[in-house]
């Protein structure tokens, strides 16, 4: 039987015989998601090891703290791209359920990367890439939520938290009920990964965008 969580995501009875394929998709997407583009970009551009800069995170916000907007933008696009590619390829080959499994795998790969001892990023860019691939309007709405929050408060982590928590709502608004479960799960993981940031936001000590 297909577990109830996947039935909620939209799996059909025919998938009962396809679990080896779903597991393979999950693993392949995880390995793709594990590629630490922030670290690779910063080293390739001669900016050093981004893990030794600022927050030590491998995401675009911390790459920006190297002073290179180009490196930060490239990291953002690549981290988002790996989530989108995983979803699009899986959907093309096996359909919507496989696409959601691939999105989960890519996200887990980014936050728990095999290549860095399972110490990765916070998953925001990858999450947005996954949303854009699953449903472009939902992804765009979440991106605009991030942008609006960032412009008003100038705090990247707060913008990420608002974008994450808005995603399941946008999925529901656009009628993607079978994908809302995935959105809730990934949003919850993003909030957990930002626990230290949340404490700093509450205390008023969270750095502004472009500052260390």
Named regions from a protein language model:
Residues 65-91, 102:
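Multi-pass membrane catalytic core of lipid/isoprenoid biosynthesis enzymes
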Residues 31-38, 103-114, 190-197:
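Transmembrane alpha-helical segments that form the membrane-embedded catalytic/substrate-channel core
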Residues 39-71, 195-212:
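Cytosolic, membrane-interface loops and tails of multi-pass inner-membrane proteins
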Residues 20-46:
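N-terminal signal-anchor transmembrane alpha helix
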Residues 48-60, 116-128, 155-163:
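Short, non-helical or kinked segments that cap or interrupt transmembrane helices
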Residues 64-67, 90-94, 105, 109, ...:
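Interfacial segments of multi-pass membrane proteins
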Residues 1-20:
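Short, strongly hydrophobic alpha-helical membrane anchors
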Residues 19, 23-27, 72-73, 99-104, ...:
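Hydrophobic alpha-helical transmembrane segments
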